[in-house]
């Protein structure tokens, strides 16, 4: 018999209990009863083994053992969450029937939304959602989804490049912000030029002398929104627009002349930086903005009307330019990079000592960003790659509408003591108090227009008045009592009107028509329909946005039309033929706009606001045409109809076009609808110029094709900023960029709203929808400011509060004052 112990089955009782490795989700482990955090460095030797000398040391504080997080559902814009938000299951089952393999979206671990942050969440959600929608298309869903998926990954690669540059390259994040700011300053939000011709002002695209910034022998640097018209001999011709701010004689940049100026610019900036007097040089440079650098070389006129009638542009051409916009831009960048070796040889051969000294100094101090900027600046002056591009407008047009003439009442004009009014016996003032569309005024056949020619005999055209000039003031009095039917008769100031003396409703114009109710003199509403002696209409108010309306119109109990309104504008001039303007009098004074001078329903001398009782108050406007109008007054949107006096065959030259302050509606992808024989101040998106239709008088183009429009613009503000940055003028650079931000505030408004929408979207769909609804109805800084304050984005809130209300033009006096302040401060220190 063996003396060895009998083998036993291993159980929990007889098994040697040795410490087992316990794995936690975070990667840590327990050693000696202490939870140790996971090591981030290289794992060498025996892990978590205490030395003999350390065993006598007191143990550290025990770390709590982490618990595995419970899996949560994916939210909107997160990887793995199907898009769109609604109808995904229905689209999936419907798409599975004709295309079973390409219906369900499946991204896997390569979902671009996994690396998204900030604005990238919005971009990747849109691109990936577009990919998912492509998969729902029957039969061809799979190949289309594959192509769209490749495009989404390409967009993600570009975003990764931007993220790497902003997070790793020193100073690149600020440079991207600077480029975004300069892109906002390229084409202004509203730019148009005015020419004075034979006593009338009219719109043009020709640059005035005040828009010319710098002149070379074969090139002109000018402000955006115009094209130079140069007189050579006995004829004037338009120069070729290379960029929105540079025009040349023959479409080629004169490299020799520009390189001389770049040589001087870089050399002086390098000297200031090397001597550590950058702010001193920058302040002197800013003060020098008050003086002219070079004499005039060319005779610029305004007799060409460059690109005012570009011809018909289809939506296909616009879409083609948009698709082709990236390829020439890439070619332009690559061409400039490949041109650097030749540029270095040209520097040495051409003895450009300023550029060479700048490159040498910036290389020695290790400022490679400035070296690259100087190289690209010198190599880019002979680039001949041009880009034609555009952007689509985001607007909608509602073509359906009902003209509502109202109920039938026989109306006839009567002349009493030289004043025309409606026959009192034909009207029923009690029935007319119903202001709905069912009980309006009368049908066309119920009006006898035999007296209209005599009634309108006292009305005059805008061309019959003298031209105004100088600053605009306001008149104190008003026009006659019984002749408000002509556009040029200024109304009296509004006050309190007894309700018993009014027949029908009282309409006031904001410019949208609104009906004013009866109240007592203290403002408390009454409901006796004006039967009491104490019922009145309180109409005294001021012009929007400070007040409620521009003016009011009603009919008194004897059939006469009465009006009141804000004080009209006095546009200047001498003699007895001057005009007190109650509407937009652009052709007599460019500063007389409707928002500044409007005193009633007249939007222009041809058009007035259409409302249900228009044919009662203005019966001779029965043949006016109706146009859809959208306006913004004080940041508030107004959608209304305008009745315009326009007949086919009338002359509509540039001298005959009025100005209309509209945010026009779209007729097509490339056309806006404006009032007949007028123009709106919004320039075309691609060129920054005014483009009108030559044959159709109520069409203006939102997209235009210039001679050769480059995507990169050169402005004098950029030249000043480049000099200040190269010269290390830190204080002057900050002041100059503050001026640029204030100048670009109008273009930054939409950018601020987009940024606030992105911030709200990162906190969920509900917050995004709430922000969208408020931003749709409330314009201004309140909604983005509330979002920034709610989510704690205090730097953006401070930036938003620092922006001015309106974008003011950057003039030389402001720049010189900033430079003078810095110069005095340096001398005092």
Swiss-Prot record:
UniProt-annotated stretches for the region HVR1: 385-411
Region (Interaction with STAT1): 2-23
Gene Ontology MF terms in the entry: channel activity; cysteine-type peptidase activity; RNA binding; structural molecule activity
Superkingdom: Viruses
Biased segments, Low complexity type: 32-47
Residue ranges, annotated region (PKR/eIF2-alpha phosphorylation homology domain (PePHD)): 660-671
Entry similarity comment: Belongs to the hepacivirus polyprotein family.
Protein's name in the database: Genome polyprotein
Organism: Hepatitis C virus (isolate Glasgow)
């Amino acid at each position: 018999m063996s003396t060895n112990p009998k083998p036993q089955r291993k159980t929990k009782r007889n098994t040697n209990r040795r410490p087992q490795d316990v794995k936690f989700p975070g990667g840590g482990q327990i050693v000696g009863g202490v939870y140790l955090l996971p090591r981030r460095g290289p794992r060498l030797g025996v892990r978590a083994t205490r030395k003999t000398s350390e065993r006598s040391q007191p143990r550290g504080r025990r770390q709590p053992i982490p618990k595995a997080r419970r899996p949560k559902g994916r939210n909107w814009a997160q990887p793995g969450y199907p898009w769109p938000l609604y109808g995904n299951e229905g689209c999936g089952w419907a798409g599975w029937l004709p295309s079973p393999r390409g219906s369900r979206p499946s991204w896997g671990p390569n979902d671009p939304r996994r690396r998204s942050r900030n604005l990238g969440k919005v971009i990747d959600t849109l691109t990936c959602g577009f990919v998912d929608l492509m998969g729902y298309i029957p039969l061809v869903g799979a190949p289309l989804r594959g192509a769209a998926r490749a495009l989404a990954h390409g967009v993600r690669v570009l975003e990764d490049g931007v993220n790497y540059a902003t997070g790793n390259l020193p100073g690149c994040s600020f440079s991207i912000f600077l480029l975004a700011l300069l892109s906002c300053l390229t084409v202004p939000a509203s730019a148009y030029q005015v020419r004075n011709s034979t006593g009338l002002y009219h719109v043009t695209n020709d640059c005035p002398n005040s828009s010319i910034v710098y002149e070379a022998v074969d090139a002109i640097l000018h402000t955006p929104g115009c094209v130079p018209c140069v007189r050579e001999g006995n004829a004037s011709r338009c120069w070729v627009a290379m960029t929105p701010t540079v025009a040349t004689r023959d479409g080629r940049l004169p490299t020799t002349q520009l390189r001389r100026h770049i040589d001087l610019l870089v050399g002086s900036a390098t000297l200031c930086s090397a001597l550590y007097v950058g702010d001193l040089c920058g302040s002197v440079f800013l003060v020098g903005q008050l003086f002219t650098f070079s004499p005039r070389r060319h005779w610029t006129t305004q007799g060409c009307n460059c690109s005012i009638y570009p011809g018909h542009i289809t939506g296909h051409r616009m879409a083609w330019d948009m698709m082709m916009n990236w390829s020439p831009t890439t070619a332009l960048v690559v061409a400039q990079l490949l041109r650097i070796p030749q540029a270095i040889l040209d520097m040495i051969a051409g003895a450009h000592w300023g550029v060479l000294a700048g490159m040498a100094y910036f290389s020695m101090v290790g400022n490679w960003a400035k070296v690259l900027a100087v190289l690209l600046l010198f190599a880019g002056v002979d680039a001949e790659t041009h880009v034609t591009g555009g952007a689509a407008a985001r607007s909608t047009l509602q073509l359906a509408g009902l003209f509502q003439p109202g109920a039938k009442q026989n109306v006839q004009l009567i002349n009493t003591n030289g004043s025309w009014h409606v026959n009192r016996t034909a009207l029923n003032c009690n029935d007319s108090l119903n202001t709905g569309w069912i009980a309006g005024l009368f049908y066309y056949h119920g009006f006898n227009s035999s007296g209209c020619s005599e009634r309108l005999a006292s009305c005059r055209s805008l061309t019959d008045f003298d031209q105004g000039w100088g600053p605009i003031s306001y008149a104190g009095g008003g026009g006659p009592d019984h002749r408000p039917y002509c556009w040029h008769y200024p109304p009296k100031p509004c006050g309190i009107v007894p309700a018993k003396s009014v027949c029908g409703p009282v309409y006031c114009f904001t410019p949208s028509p609104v009906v004013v109710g009866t109240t007592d003199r203290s403002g408390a509403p009454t409901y006796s329909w004006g039967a009491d002696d104490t019922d009145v209409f309180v109409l005294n108010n001021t012009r929007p946005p400070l007040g409620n309306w521009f003016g009011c119109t009603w009919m008194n109990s004897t059939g006469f039309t009465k009006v009141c309104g804000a004080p009209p504008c006095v546009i200047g001039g001498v003699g007895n033929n001057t005009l007190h303007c109650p509407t937009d009098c652009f052709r007599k004074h460019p500063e007389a706009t409707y928002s500044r001078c409007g005193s009633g329903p007249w939007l222009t001398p041809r058009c007035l606001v259409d409302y249900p009782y228009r044919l009662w108050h203005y019966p001779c406007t029965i043949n006016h045409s109706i146009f859809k109008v959208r306006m913004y007054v004080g940041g508030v949107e107004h959608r209304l109809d305008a009745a315009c006096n326009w007949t086919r065959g009338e002359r509509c030259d540039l001298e005959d076009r009025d100005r209309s302050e509209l945010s026009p509606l779209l007729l097509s992808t490339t056309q806006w609808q404006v009032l007949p024989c007028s123009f709106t101040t919004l320039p075309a998106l691609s060129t920054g110029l005014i483009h009108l239709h030559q044959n159709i008088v109520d069409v203006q183009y939102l997209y235009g094709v210039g001679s050769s429009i480059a995507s990169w613009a050169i402005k004098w503000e950029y030249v000043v900023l480049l000099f200040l940055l190269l010269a290390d003028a830190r204080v002057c650079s900050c002041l100059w960029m503050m001026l640029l931000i204030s100048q670009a505030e109008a273009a930054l408004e939409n950018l601020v709203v987009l940024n606030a929408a992105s911030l709200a979207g990162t906190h969920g769909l509900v917050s995004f929808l709430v922000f969208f609804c408020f931003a749709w109805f409330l314009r201004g800084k309140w909604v983005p400011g509330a979002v920034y304050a709610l989510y704690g984005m205090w730097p953006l809130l401070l930036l938003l509060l620092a922006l001015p209300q309106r974008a003011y033009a950057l003039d030389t006096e402001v720049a010189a004052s900033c430079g003078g302040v810095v110069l005095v401060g340096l001398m005092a220190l």
